[in-house]
Amino acid sequence: MTAIKLIVGLGNPGAEYEQTRHNAGALFVERIAHAQNVNLVADRKYFGLTGRFSHQGQDVRLLIPTTYMNRSGQAVAALAGFFRIKPEEILVAHDELDLPPGVAKLKVGGGHGGHNGLRDIIAQLGNQNTFHRLRLGIGHPGVASMVSNFVLGRAPRAEQEKLDASIDFALGVLPDILAGEWNRAMKNLHSQKA
């Protein structure tokens, strides 16, 4: 029952990447910040946009790395190191090709599955992969050679609405996630699909 002290939302910086599939994790953190009335502020020390709120007397930090996706670990390691946050106290929200739009799944630990942001976080945390993940389904283009353009593209409206719904589902179980009630959070989240 590990409580979460840091929520990271992966994406790429800049207007050209806003609302792209690859920025699904960043969108999740933006939605948390909005719900908690937190202003995300650029902080060069942590290579990202950061914020903080309190949940049941515990500080919860938010981070959207402003490095490019493949350097996300630089931001995560800097913030987690400074505040002495252990890998198992971190939740990383990211886009997931292996899930359809409208589906969100929680996962504890594991490999990077080809995701460059996760790959760099694992490396920068000293090859520790025990952090939690929120996998936000974006679907797969069907052909490996199309993946790069697919993740860096904007989803059609119907797909975006499903992604937004999956983020809503994840926000609904956020209190359980923050409290470390992983079984309850997984049961509730995994039973929902847009």
Swiss-Prot record:
Q: What is this protein called?
A: Peptidyl-tRNA hydrolase
What are the annotated GO cellular component locations?
A: cytoplasm
User: Can you list the disulfide-bonded cysteine pairs?
Assistant: none
Family statement:
Belongs to the PTH family.
**What is the reaction catalyzed?**
an N-acyl-L-alpha-aminoacyl-tRNA + H2O = an N-acyl-L-amino acid + a tRNA + H(+)
Keyword Kinase attributed:
no
EC number(s) per UniProt? 3.1.1.29
A GO molecular-function annotation? tRNA binding
Q: Has the keyword Metal-binding been applied to this entry?
A: no
- In chain numbering, the residues marked as site (Stabilizes the basic form of H active site to accept a proton) are 95
Active-site residues?
22 (proton acceptor)
User: Which HAMAP family does this entry report, sorted A to Z?
Assistant: Pept_tRNA_hydro_bact (MF_00083)
Extract the Pfam families matched here.
Pept_tRNA_hydro
Q: What is its main location?
A: cytoplasm
Q: Cite the entry's keywords alphabetically.
A: Cytoplasm, Hydrolase, RNA-binding, tRNA-binding
Compartments it resides in: Cytoplasm
Give the binding site residues for tRNA.
17, 68, 70, 116
User: Which residues of this protein are annotated with the site description Discriminates between blocked and unblocked aminoacyl-tRNA?
Assistant: 12
Q: Function, please?
A: Hydrolyzes ribosome-free peptidyl-tRNAs (with 1 or more amino acids incorporated), which drop off the ribosome during protein synthesis, or as a result of ribosome stalling. Catalyzes the release of premature peptidyl moieties from peptidyl-tRNA molecules trapped in stalled 50S ribosomal subunits, and thus maintains levels of free tRNAs and 50S ribosomes.
User: Species name for this entry?
Assistant: Pseudomonas fluorescens (strain Pf0-1)
User: Mind listing the GO biological process terms from this record?
Assistant: protein quality control for misfolded or incompletely synthesized proteins; rescue of stalled ribosome
Q: How does this polypeptide assemble, per the annotation? A: Monomer.
